[in-house]
């Protein structure tokens, strides 16, 4: 009877780890998170941001 109990506990542990690995990856902290827009001005704003950080080669581009 003791071996059966251990076998059932091991099987339950293996199944629970399989469920965690195959889950959708939703973390409790991320569930209510609001998606953040890192580039509110779109692709052109992202390009200008890169130019500003890298040192703009041509002044009219950098504004």
Curated annotation (Swiss-Prot):
- According to the UniProt record, where is the region Disordered? 23-46
Q: Where are the D-tryptophan residues found in this chain?
A: 58
Q: Chief location of this protein? A: secreted
What would be an example GO MF term here? calcium channel regulator activity
Q: Which residues carry this modification: 4-hydroxyproline?
A: 57
Residues modified as Cysteine amide? 62
Q: Is Signal one of the keywords UniProt gives this record?
A: yes
Residue ranges annotated as propeptide are: 24-54
State the InterPro entries in the record.
Conotoxin, Contryphan_CS
Q: Which GO terms describe its cellular component?
A: extracellular region
Show the PROSITE patterns listed in the entry: CONTRYPHAN
| The entry's keywords | Amidation, Bromination, Calcium channel impairing toxin, D-amino acid, Disulfide bond, Hydroxylation, Ion channel impairing toxin, Neurotoxin, Secreted, Signal, Toxin, Voltage-gated calcium channel impairing toxin
| Signal sequence residues | 1-23
Which Pfam families does the protein's record reference? Conotoxin
Query: Residue ranges under compositional bias (Basic and acidic residues)?
Result: 28-39
Q: Does the keyword Disulfide bond apply?
A: yes
What is its biological role?
Inhibits high voltage-activated calcium channels (Cav).
Additional notes on this entry: Three forms of this peptide have been described. Am918 is 7 residues long and is hydroxylated and amidated; Am975 is 8 residues long and is also hydroxylated and amidated, while Ama1054 is only different from Am975 by an additional Trp bromination. An amidated peptide of 8 residues with identical sequence but without hydrolation is described in Conus buxeus loroisii venom (AC P0C250).
**What is the UniProt domain comment for this protein?**
The cysteine framework is C-C.
Q: Which family does it belong to?
A: Belongs to the O2 superfamily. Contryphan family.
Q: What is this protein called?
A: Contryphan-Am
Species per Swiss-Prot/TrEMBL record: Conus amadis (Amadis cone)
């Amino acid at each position: 009877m003791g071996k059966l109990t251990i076998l059932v506990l091991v099987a339950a542990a293996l199944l629970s780890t399989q469920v965690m690995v195959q889950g959708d990856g939703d973390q409790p902290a991320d569930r209510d998170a609001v998606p953040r827009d890192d580039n509110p001005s779109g692709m052109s704003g992202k390009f200008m941001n890169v130019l500003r950080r890298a040192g703009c080669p041509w002044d009219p581009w950098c504004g």
